[in-house]
């Protein structure tokens, strides 16, 4: 083999090694981002489950004190029943937002009932649900950050080439609905 042929073979091998390195590095980075998104959603799901478990206690505590507001209590129960952790993430997010809206409606109605506002059990449950809502918001921010990083990564070169090869699609954000942007007062 001549020195020129050896040099050409080395150059081709080096270029192939660099291309392979870039592809593997980008593939691994995308896989890591996908895992972070899944973990971030799992963290949200834990808090959604905790809130899901607290809602019957809140409805039960309020039901006896608010005999005339069954529609609001029914809305909370319906929103709770609609949530299922086995659904795809976008549907889970929609049901989580519906539950948040129903709980906020309940808290707004509770404001009209002094006997409910002063009930210690209701106050404790409201504090716990508000704490969980705050945790959901924090974890939603982390989830959306990971989704942003992933979506940005798969839409830029050279990773977009891998994305088209492997069928990677942008992930949906867990976005706040307009009525969620401003928190209503919930002091009991």
Regions found by a protein language model. Give the residues of each.
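A helix-centric hydrophobic-segment signal that preferentially recognizes long
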Residues: 2-188
């Amino acid at each position: 083999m001549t020195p020129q042929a050896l040099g050409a073979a080395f150059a081709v091998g080096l270029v192939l090694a660099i291309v392979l390195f870039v592809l593997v590095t980008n593939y691994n980075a995308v896989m890591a981002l996908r895992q972070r998104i899944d973990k971030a959603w799992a963290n949200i799901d834990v808090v959604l489950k905790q809130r899901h478990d607290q809602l019957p206690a809140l409805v039960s505590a309020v039901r006896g004190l608010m005999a005339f507001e069954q529609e609001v209590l029914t809305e909370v129960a319906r929103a709770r029943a609609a949530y299922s952790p086995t659904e795809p993430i976008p549907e889970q997010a929609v049901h989580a937002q519906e539950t948040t809206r129903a709980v906020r409606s309940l808290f707004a109605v509770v404001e009209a009932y002094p006997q409910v506002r002063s009930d210690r059990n209701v106050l404790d449950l409201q504090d716990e649900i508000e704490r969980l809502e705050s945790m959901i918001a924090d974890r939603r921010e982390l989830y959306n950050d990971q989704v942003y990083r992933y979506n940005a990564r798969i839409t830029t070169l050279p990773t977009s080439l891998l994305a088209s090869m492997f069928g990677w699609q942008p992930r949906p954000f867990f976005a706040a609905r307009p009525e969620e942007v401003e928190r209503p007062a919930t002091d009991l």
